[in-house]
Amino acid sequence: MDARDIIKRPVVTEESTSILDDKKYTFEVDTRATKTQVKYAIEEIFDVKVAKVNVMNYKGKLKRMGRYAGYTNKRRKAIVTVTADSKEIQFFEV
């Protein structure tokens, strides 16, 4: 898998912006990606040194449209902690 295929998009929420001070960045990643693949992808794309990766899996929610039921896509979210001597990822700057 290519690094750009592993990292889908940044997750910008109130909680994810509050942990930016601790050099923790939140991304939505491919559901098949491992922690090691996420680490190498972040280091390749943003040119930073990753200290730790935490991942969370989310099941798809049941959604109904009248009598038809289906599920939303399952998701995988990664919180990436970069080292103290790494530069900030400018992707999140406003």
Swiss-Prot record:
Source organism, top-level taxon: Bacteria
User: Which terms does the record give in the GO molecular function aspect?
Assistant: rRNA binding; structural constituent of ribosome
The family database entries (InterPro entries) matched by this protein are listed as: Nucleotide-bd_a/b_plait_sf, Ribosomal_uL23-like, Ribosomal_uL23/eL15/eS24_sf
Function according to Swiss-Prot or TrEMBL = One of the early assembly proteins it binds 23S rRNA. One of the proteins that surrounds the polypeptide exit tunnel on the outside of the ribosome. Forms the main docking site for trigger factor binding to the ribosome.
Which Gene Ontology cellular component terms are annotated?
A: ribonucleoprotein complex; ribosome
One GO BP annotation is: translation
Species of origin: Listeria welshimeri serovar 6b (strain ATCC 35897 / DSM 20650 / CCUG 15529 / CIP 8149 / NCTC 11857 / SLCC 5334 / V8)
Q: Which gene encodes it?
A: rplW
Quaternary structure, per UniProt, is:
Part of the 50S ribosomal subunit. Contacts protein L29, and trigger factor when it is bound to the ribosome.
What's in the keyword line of the UniProt record?
A: Ribonucleoprotein, Ribosomal protein, RNA-binding, rRNA-binding
What family is it from?
A: Belongs to the universal ribosomal protein uL23 family.
Name of the protein this chain belongs to: Large ribosomal subunit protein uL23
